[in-house]
């Protein structure tokens, strides 16, 4: 279902980048994914929110760092989860062990949002759609294809997401003593969860974009001033992926999906 007109509660439906150099970041992602941009003024004089588009569809956004951000705060790709009633979900966050970073507020007529952290410290946005449903094109080259919660306490985190947004999960062993949890909104598989692959990685929601060639995209990212954090590698039955960073230091992954059987 590449084109989307709605999202079930619990489904990651949007990603945006907060960066220290918005202009440079836009050029980098255009070189990688072919994105264009629609710039929308941020209320309160906070610059512009650059809506990334592909084939006329909204696929992501690139924004400046938020006002009052701590000095040295690294650029980051944020994940947002669709909710039916953001205020009702926010009311469950603190009792569930999380924290409310930004109380619910309206973004004009686009929607209503909040930003929270789960009990393991991973930050995530909550989005109640109005005019803006989130990404209207996914799972195609240059668009969002997967969102993955990396946390050192997966059981604690997943109990929280089940309580606040109704996400369930199934589990599979991917290596000796290492499980991968597939997140589900109803019967649909909408994301993943695993422990960080290396020491020192903070708990966070990680973003994957679809590409035609993971190796070529990694090389292109490096040539454009980014870095290859993890060299391209195969995931059996899933595809070939690489972990990259943009020139400002925001980390993301690219995935060439395996052919569908």
Curated annotation (Swiss-Prot):
Its main location: secreted. Keywords: Repeat, Secreted, Virulence. It is found in: Secreted. Transmembrane segments: none annotated. Overexpression confers resistance to pyrimidine-imidazoles (PIs) compounds. PANTHER family: GB|AAF24581.1, GLYOXALASE-RELATED. This is Putative glyoxylase CFP32. It comes from Mycobacterium tuberculosis (strain ATCC 25618 / H37Rv).
